[in-house]
Amino acid sequence: MIEFVRGEVAYVCAEFVTIEVGGIGYKIVAPNPFFYRTGDEQVIVYTYHYVREDQEVLFGFRSRRERALFTKLLGVTGIGPKGSLAIVASGDVDALVEAIEQEKESYLIKFPGVGKKTAKQMTLDLKGKLAELAPDYIPSEGLFAQGNAELNEACEALTALGYSEREVEKVKKALQGEVLSTDQYVKRALQLLLNVR
């Protein structure tokens, strides 16, 4: 199985993104393809290889958590890959996990293709099985965790520019799947922050 694809964004459309790796273009169906931009130097897309008799699709996600949620949703009776992808695209992982654990069907029916019956099935099939996706399960690494030195430096620069820890953390999460220089991280983060404000 392919764990992830790291490469340049060659093409983006409403349904998929093409990542070029060593001269080969991987067509990856993603929840929000327009998150990626053509010309991005290096991105990491966490993949799920979906194989059935009649189709073979490579699905891609910005984080391992998104991918884990997608695979859990595939196990729900009545939700296929399209439905799972739409839910991941429309929702926040933390809010969705909370809604399932607390059986908030009114929240779940807001997703495309999810009615009362499917919402009930989601809580029935997934309640108690999403511990690894719950926010308090994730190891608390702090804002400037080890791992990506360039991204951490960019976060420090944003803090020095006066952005709040909350804003910086949000941007850091959005950029974790990308491999950029410190300057490129800062530029990309500022673009994201200016769009939010």
UniProtKB/Swiss-Prot annotation:
Primary site of residence: cytoplasm
InterPro entries in alphabetical order: DNA_helicase_Holl-junc_RuvA_I, NA-bd_OB-fold, RuvA, RuvA_2-like, RuvA_C, RuvA_C_sf
GO molecular function, one term: ATP binding
Positions of region (Flexible linker): 141-145
GO cellular component, one term: Holliday junction helicase complex
Region (Domain II): 63-141
Keywords from the UniProt entry: Cytoplasm, DNA damage, DNA recombination, DNA repair, DNA-binding
Gene Ontology process terms (BP): DNA recombination; DNA repair
Compartment annotation: Cytoplasm
Region annotation Domain I: where it falls in the sequence: 1-62
UniProt key word 4Fe-4S: no
CDD domains cross-referenced by the UniProt entry: UBA_RuvA_C (cd14332)
Region Domain III, annotated ranges: 146-197
Function text: The RuvA-RuvB-RuvC complex processes Holliday junction (HJ) DNA during genetic recombination and DNA repair, while the RuvA-RuvB complex plays an important role in the rescue of blocked DNA replication forks via replication fork reversal (RFR). RuvA specifically binds to HJ cruciform DNA, conferring on it an open structure. The RuvB hexamer acts as an ATP-dependent pump, pulling dsDNA into and through the RuvAB complex. HJ branch migration allows RuvC to scan DNA until it finds its consensus sequence, where it cleaves and resolves the cruciform DNA.
Protein family (similarity comment): Belongs to the RuvA family.
HAMAP family hit by this protein: DNA_HJ_migration_RuvA (MF_00031)
Comment field on protein domains: Has three domains with a flexible linker between the domains II and III and assumes an 'L' shape. Domain III is highly mobile and contacts RuvB.
NCBIfam families cross-referenced by the UniProt entry: ruvA
Subunit description: Homotetramer. Forms an RuvA(8)-RuvB(12)-Holliday junction (HJ) complex. HJ DNA is sandwiched between 2 RuvA tetramers; dsDNA enters through RuvA and exits via RuvB. An RuvB hexamer assembles on each DNA strand where it exits the tetramer. Each RuvB hexamer is contacted by two RuvA subunits (via domain III) on 2 adjacent RuvB subunits; this complex drives branch migration. In the full resolvosome a probable DNA-RuvA(4)-RuvB(12)-RuvC(2) complex forms which resolves the HJ.
Designated name of the protein: Holliday junction branch migration complex subunit RuvA
Organism: Exiguobacterium sibiricum (strain DSM 17290 / CCUG 55495 / CIP 109462 / JCM 13490 / 255-15)
